[in-house]
């Protein structure tokens, strides 16, 4: 007799076996070009091997496609699309439930900073240590186990169930090979017929909002000069600091807390702040002619990223037009030095460089059937529903929402270990996770 979907439980041995194989590949899954370009097929082969007995080609029910979006340049970086077909497939009103976003690449791990081997699954009680346990190979193993159970039990579902494991999530320097390319090519179009759960978050509660991110370099231009003669130049270190302070002042006026942030319970409003200095080649007794502060902007999804960039560029244009109105640092600190006998004129200026494409934040639709089912399932299994919103960024998710997908977000690793040394996840969380996901499917089937 077929077991009800809502009764599925994690096959612990099978899950840990697959996860161990995936973590064992992570040294070659690290993503930081150009030095570290992942070979996601090294992980994908273990997923395919686990699912092979259940594929239609072998007498099973699952359909699987490995998609290399740029096979010429990246022949070993394949996305994996898995489908458990529902009874509505091929009808005029197909229904789908999709689990997307669990990725096959990982962030780099420094062995010397870890207490354990990051490239090996190490089990200590409930804790599963290794790079990718939380982000995001644990989710890959979890969903693979879910599909094996579907293929074994063969429930008659109206909805087709999809999983999409993606490449190149942890770094966007090589575009056009991951979920963005799958979307643009139409490979994900069937997933528009129902909720899409982005399974790459943490702490087992729904994430209902994320922030957008834009990195920047702010550079002040002056002129190199001996530090004994500050009156003859524009000190770029002073200028870049004062300019940034003025830009931040204006930013927080224009991008103040949005009323919807309270509804979504964002833990932080939009921010603009410095995070790095570019190294300055010089000495203690040289005033540098150029200084650069680096940082990022985090924008809640209720503001537009393009409008934000235009605003900031406007601040800088105004600052340059009125450079002498910035606060100076004493009687010999000036941002416009006029010509005089023996002194060449120097006028300071600032410029901003936007690094890469901005990732926009997303506000999930709280009135959708997809969210309601996930919320109810989470509450039933964990005993409470406490959705979160964060200014952390999930690349590409907003693009999918803008393409017409009903995006919902969840995940079952540990937030505190994301991208961290000694990353771990809890086996007990994954045991609950399969119950949450299978109950979500069950609720949508009954809707």
UniProtKB/Swiss-Prot annotation:
Keywords: Amino-acid biosynthesis, Arginine biosynthesis, Cobalt, Hydrolase, Metal-binding, Zinc. Binds 2 Zn(2+) or Co(2+) ions per subunit. InterPro entries: Bact_exopeptidase_dim_dom, Peptidase_M20, Peptidase_M20_dimer, Peptidase_M20A. Zn(2+) 1 binds at residues 103, 135. One of its GO terms (cellular component) is phagocytic vesicle. Zn(2+) 2 binds at residues 135, 170, 419. Transmembrane segments: none annotated. It is an enzyme of class 3 (hydrolase). Its EC number is 3.5.1.16. This is Acetylornithine deacetylase. Its cofactor is Zn(2+); Co(2+). One of its GO terms (biological process) is L-arginine biosynthetic process. Homodimer. It comes from Dictyostelium discoideum. The active site is at residues 105, 169. Pathway: Amino-acid biosynthesis; L-arginine biosynthesis; L-ornithine from N(2)-acetyl-L-ornithine (linear): step 1/1. The gene is argE. GO terms for molecular function: acetylornithine deacetylase activity; metal ion binding. It comes from the Eukaryota. CDD domains: M20_ArgE-related (cd08012).
């Amino acid at each position: 007799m077929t077991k009800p979907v809502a009764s599925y439980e994690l096959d612990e041995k099978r899950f840990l076996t697959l996860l161990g194989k995936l973590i064992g590949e992570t040294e070659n899954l690290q993503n930081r070009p150009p030095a570290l370009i992942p070979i996601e097929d090294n992980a994908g082969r273990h997923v395919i091997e686990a699912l092979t007995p259940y594929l239609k080609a072998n007498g099973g029910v699952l359909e699987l496609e490995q998609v290399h979006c740029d096979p010429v340049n990246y022949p070993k970086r394949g996305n994996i699309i898995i489908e458990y077909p529902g009874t509505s497939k091929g009808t005029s009103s197909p229904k789908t439930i999709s689990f997307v976003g669990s990725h096959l690449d990982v962030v780099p791990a420094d062995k010397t900073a870890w207490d354990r081997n990051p490239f090996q699954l190490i089990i200590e009680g409930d804790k599963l240590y290794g790079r990718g346990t939380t982000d995001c190979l644990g989710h890959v193993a979890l969903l693979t186990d879910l599909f094996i159970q579907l293929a074994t039990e063969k429930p008659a579902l109206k909805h087709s169930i999809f999983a999409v494991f993606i490449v190149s999530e942890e770094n966007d320097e090589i575009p056009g090979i991951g979920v963005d390319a799958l979307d643009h090519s139409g490979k994900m179009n069937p997933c528009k017929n129902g909720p899409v759960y982005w399974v790459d978050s943490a702490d087992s509660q729904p994430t209902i909002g994320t922030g957008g991110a834009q990195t920047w370099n702010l550079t002040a231009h002056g002129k190199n000069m001996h530090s004994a003669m500050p009156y003859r130049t524009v000190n770029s270190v002073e200028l870049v600091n004062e300019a940034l302070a003025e830009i931040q002042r204006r930013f927080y006026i224009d991008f103040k807390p949005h009323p919807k942030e309270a509804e979504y319970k964002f833990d932080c409003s939009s921010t603009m702040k410095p995070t790095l200095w570019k190294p300055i080649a010089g000495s203690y007794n040289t005033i540098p002619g150029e200084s650069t502060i680096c940082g990022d902007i985090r924008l809640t999804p209720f503001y537009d990223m393009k409008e934000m960039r235009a605003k900031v560029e406007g601040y800088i244009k105004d600052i340059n037009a009125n450079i002498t109105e910035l606060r100076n640092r004493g009687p010999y600190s000036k941002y416009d030095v006029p010509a005089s006998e023996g002194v060449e004129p120097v006028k300071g200026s600032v410029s901003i460089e936007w690094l890469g494409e901005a990732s926009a934040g997303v506000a999930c639709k709280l009135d959708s059937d997809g969210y309601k089912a996930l919320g109810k399932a989470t509450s039933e299994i964990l005993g409470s529903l406490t959705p979160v919103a964060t200014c952390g960024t999930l690349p590409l998710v907003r693009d999918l929402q803008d393409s017409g997908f009903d995006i919902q977000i969840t995940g079952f690793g540990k937030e505190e270990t994301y991208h961290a040394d000694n990353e771990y996840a809890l086996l007990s969380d994954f045991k609950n996770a399969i119950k949450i996901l299978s109950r979500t499917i069950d609720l949508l089937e009954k809707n």
